[in-house]
Each structure stands twice: as C-alpha cells, then as structure tokens.
Amino acid sequence: LLVTLNKGDYVMAGVNHNSHGAQVIFPDDPQFEGMPKNADDRRFMVMPAYLGGKYQMAGMKWYGSNCENKASGLPRSILMMMLNDKDTGAPLALMSANLVSCYRTGAIPGVGAKYLARKDSETVTIIGPGVMGRTCLLAFLSVCPKITTVKVKGRGQRSLHAFEEFVKKECPQIQQVIVCDSMEEAVKDSDIICVTSTAPVKEISHISQKTGSKKVHSSVCHRLHGLMMIF
C-alpha cells in the first residue's frame, strides 16, 4: 500500500487529485427548523479516492461526528466505507469503518515512530485514552520494542480505567502505566508524545520536553486539512 502511494498511483478528491475530502459544517445560527447547529466536532465528511497497484479499487469513507453522541452511548464518530468497481461504478461492499479507521489512524503515527523516534525509546505518553489512543499505542509498541512505560492523561476515570485494562490485556511488554494529573507530568521525560484528544496543541508546546522526543498529533486532522503532525 505505501509503495503504491509513494509511486503516486492513486487519485483523491479535488482539482489537484490530493484533497483529503469535503466537510459539511453547520452554521452557528441556523435559520431553518431542524437544521443542526455548529458545535465542537459536529460535522459530516466524505473522503473519496481511487487506489491503483494491485488494488484497482475506488471507494470512499463517509462519517458523521458529534461529541454529544457519548450521552447516547455512541462513539463520537460513526463511519461507513463504500467500495466500488473502478470501471462500472457498481458497489462491491458497504461496511462499518470505525475499526478500520481507528487502526489506520494508529498505523500512521506508528510509521512515523519507526523512522523518527529514538531507537531506545522506553516511555510513551498517550493524551486521550480512547480507541485512537489504543491503536496508536499498539503501533508504537510494534516498532519500538524497548517501550516499557505508558503515561496517560485523560478527562474521565471511566476512560482511564478502560485504557489501563486494555494495556494489561493487550500489551504484555508494558511494565508500568502511569495516570497523570497534569500535562506537565504526562509530557515530562517521555520519548514519544501522542495527542489523540481534541486538546489544543498549545497545551503542550510550552512544556519542557525530553531532547529527541517525538510528538504526534493524531486528532487535529479536521483542523489542518488532514495533515498528520509528526515532528
């Protein structure tokens, strides 16, 4: 897949064939009854593309996002994926894309860590212990086998507890999970810092960080037109 993308054998949306997709963002003050009101993470988005190489496939990801979904026991984003025959346009598959998207989102920071993180990285920080935080952690562990400590910063005890249980079950190489009360505590002395919540970037940019550490902001895609920040 990455080789195919590197060759440029793909087409995405937009006149430059490289657009991340198109968003539907509602007005701050709707003038029509029933129209949703703009809010944090309240949007619909479609991401169409064609992929060549051995795949020869067209398709798209479509999702709606609303932070208020949590009150109904639903994930913030609910995603679907459609695959189509590249020539006829006939639908080949329509499926849930939440799991696929989460692992894709985690895999990209993993690739970044493989080439940019310190080879002796031992401590990783996860800011935002949700599903994306979990998949990012799995990706980091797959390319940085010396990681033994995870520091986590979250907003609620339920998500923090669930994250701890996940690490105990799925990440046997982790010897210590540290739940942090502040950003300063979470960021200090970490080799890899991963932000998967909607916390503003400025919350960590001013904090003294370990020399050579790598920062990954996986949750700012909708604000930065799909750019994954790894530096």
Task: Name each model feature, range by range.
Residues 1-102, 108-110, 120:
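N-terminal ligand-binding/catalytic initiation module
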Residues 197-199, 222-223:
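Short glycine-/small-residue-rich Rossmann-like dinucleotide-binding loops
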Residues 216-231:
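Rossmann-fold NAD(P)-binding glycine/threonine-rich loop
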Residues 143-170:
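NAD(P)-binding Rossmann-fold cofactor-contacting core
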Residues 200-217:
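Rossmann-fold NAD(P) dinucleotide-binding segment
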Residues 116-123, 146-147:
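Short helix-loop-beta connector
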Residues 129-130:
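Glycine-rich Rossmann-fold phosphate-binding loop(s) that bind the pyrophosphate
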Residues 174-190, 205-207:
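Short acidic low-complexity segments
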